[in-house]
């Protein structure tokens, strides 16, 4: 009996040790366990090598860094993924989700890598990157004026191929040609046609999403609540976007100007004050923007000095004569002449405002829109405010003077007017709520080259943001998801389901729409698998 008891005890110990070892091995080797699981979704091992990159792969760092557009996040101390998956088929996305869940890894989804806080490729816990660079199909139907665009397609590629099909069609989307459709449409997406047709997200009519269960859903199968949430609510909180179906829009030739003003600040603020009071009131066919940056100049005495260069730039869906007449009647202080204006095709307008050509060039080669490496950035930080009433001239003097506190050319402000159709769209039409009552967006941007200068420049932009508190939107102070800013709040890392904590930043991005997003999240991802520092949390189970 004693022998039997001992034998039973010994066998139990062996079994316990065996299972403990396997559990510990599973925990200790999440990368290997993920790869073993993922191999089931890749029947050809040769193909697998082109889809999966681990830290042992000589191409790993090249793939990781290739679409990091903010060099703040390329240091040796920046957390790196255990695995990068570059799917070429939806089944690879399904496998990544299911295997990441199985072995306890988080997912970061990267389409173009333009997340200003690096959240599409950084996590503080072990993670996998799903890099959608190979999911870039664009299928255009000119007859119905729609297009299916996969998440990894760049805006430049979409503009290019739509123009190839019909030069009188385009899309209501952004300026930067290397931004990809996945994140841009999922976060809102403003651009030169915003006052005519709304945001990129306002023009989504269907979507393909892989959900937490690995199922591929379209608008019909996902339901209207989830479809609503994806369009401007940050699709990464709900699954992985495979493709958007977007509405294409009619575009005539456009007229543009970009005039530079160099003058004393007290004179300049009078122009700015005039702009504040009229830019949002213009007919929707005119977009009049302005931005400010410091440059070195030589004065009349031949001395070098630093001056603020102010640019007033337009996009007008009409002819030169009409624009000059309108500007001379409404804003004669700018002194716009015919010689300041250029009439361009819409595709050339996009090329100009993409920043890859000079204003006076006649060489608008649209092939540049296909260059996925164009316009690589240095280190930068962006913050944004929404302005609901004109800022006093005396305050704008102080705002502009603060540009001199930053390195020459490193700091910039930009003012982007609302109005037009944005006033007509309900704040609850999609999660993006910033509509009627907004005069303009005010961007604060700083950029630099050396990692060791990070704190210096971050302090400058945070100081100007704090200074602006009394003069911008409040209760809450509004923000824009596609200019993500972790300074405004993050989820509790110890309790990522904390609704109260998430509401701090959530209402700044989404206003009253935040609670509806939480309800959708609770229904479709109740265990909060798709999460990051600013992801929508589910409600606790007892509050469902």
UniProtKB/Swiss-Prot annotation:
InterPro entries: BBE, FAD-bd_PCMH, FAD-bd_PCMH-like_sf, FAD-bd_PCMH_sub1, FAD-bd_PCMH_sub2, Oxid_FAD_bind_N
Pathway: Secondary metabolite biosynthesis; terpenoid biosynthesis
Pfam families the record matches: BBE, FAD_binding_4
Alphabetic keyword roster: Apoplast, Disulfide bond, FAD, Flavoprotein, Glycoprotein, Oxidoreductase, Secreted, Signal
Binding site for cannabigerolate: 291, 416, 441
Disulphides: 37-99
Main location: secreted
First-tier enzyme category under EC: oxidoreductase
UniProt cofactor(s): FAD
pH-activity note: Optimum pH is 5.0.
GO MF term list: cannabidiolate synthase activity; FAD binding
UniProt note on tissues of expression: Expressed in young leaves.
Cofactor stoichiometry and binding remark: Binds 1 FAD per subunit in a bicovalent manner.
PTM summary: Glycosylated.
Catalytic reaction annotation: cannabigerolate + O2 = cannabidiolate + H2O2
Active site as annotated: 483
Annotated binding of FAD, by residue: 109-115, 120, 176, 180-184, 190, 236, 241, 480-482
Crosslink position(s): 6-(S-cysteinyl)-8alpha-(pros-histidyl)-FAD (His-Cys): 114-176
UniProt EC number: 1.21.3.8
Glycan-modified residues: 45, 65, 168, 296, 304, 328, 498
Miscellaneous comment as given in the Swiss-Prot or TrEMBL entry: CBDA synthase might contribute to the self-defense of Cannabis plants by producing both CBDA and hydrogen peroxide, but since these reaction products are toxic to the plant itself, CBDA synthase is probably secreted from secretory cells into the storage cavity to avoid cellular damage.
Subunit organization: Monomer.
Family classification: Belongs to the oxygen-dependent FAD-linked oxidoreductase family.
Protein name: Cannabidiolic acid synthase
Lineage summary: Eukaryota, Viridiplantae, Streptophyta, Embryophyta, Tracheophyta
Gene: CBDAS
